[in-house]
């Protein structure tokens, strides 16, 4: 997977341009089970999560890793129904397995959504994205 260097001020400007649009937040369900097998299995689960999100995203969307196994997809979309279709593209793969050392391991993701606020303060929004993920687990 290619890495792209991003200046955080550029990311902040991108977020400000997308004010009011939806952000989809994702997290691996039960990453601990993968890590209990091995850290490599956990890393593979995170990589697969990123690939699933990236495949659903269009070129004008931004995917950000916001934590160990937590990602945000900045959709730039304002229509809730369109956002739900996008989320379903990612979630439709829940339960599909990944292969690790000859073992099939089912991978599923949690997800929540949040809008980019009018008065964007990155630190607060970052906290809100994490809260969105936490709430999706309930």
PLM regions and their residue ranges:
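Residue-level recognition of strand-loop junctions within catalytic nucleotide-signaling folds
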Residues: 74-78, 95, 116-117
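Short hydrophobic alpha-helical segments used for membrane anchoring or interfacial signaling
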Residues: 25-27, 113
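Catalytic core regions of nucleotide second-messenger enzymes
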Residues: 64-66, 94-110
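Catalytic-core segments of nucleotide cyclases and related cyclic-nucleotide turnover enzymes
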Residues: 13, 84-91, 101, 108, ...
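Conserved long alpha-helical elements within nucleotide-processing catalytic cores of c-di-GMP signaling
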Residues: 2-22, 29-54, 64-68, 80-84, ...
């Amino acid at each position: 997977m290619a890495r792209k260097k991003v200046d955080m001020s550029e990311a902040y400007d991108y977020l400000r341009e997308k004010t009011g649009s939806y952000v989809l937040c994702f997290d691996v369900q039960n990453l601990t089970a993968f890590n209990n097998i091995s850290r490599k299995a956990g890393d593979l689960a995170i990589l697969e999560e990123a690939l699933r999100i990236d495949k659903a995203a269009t070129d004008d969307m931004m995917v950000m890793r916001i934590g160990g196994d937590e990602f945000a997809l900045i959709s730039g979309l304002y229509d809730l129904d369109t956002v739900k279709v996008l989320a379903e593209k990612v979630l439709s793969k829940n339960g599909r397995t990944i292969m690790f050392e000859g073992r099939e391991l089912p991978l599923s993701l949690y997800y929540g959504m949040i809008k980019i606020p009018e008065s964007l303060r990155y630190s607060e929004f970052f906290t809100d994205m994490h809260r969105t993920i936490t709430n999706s687990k309930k």
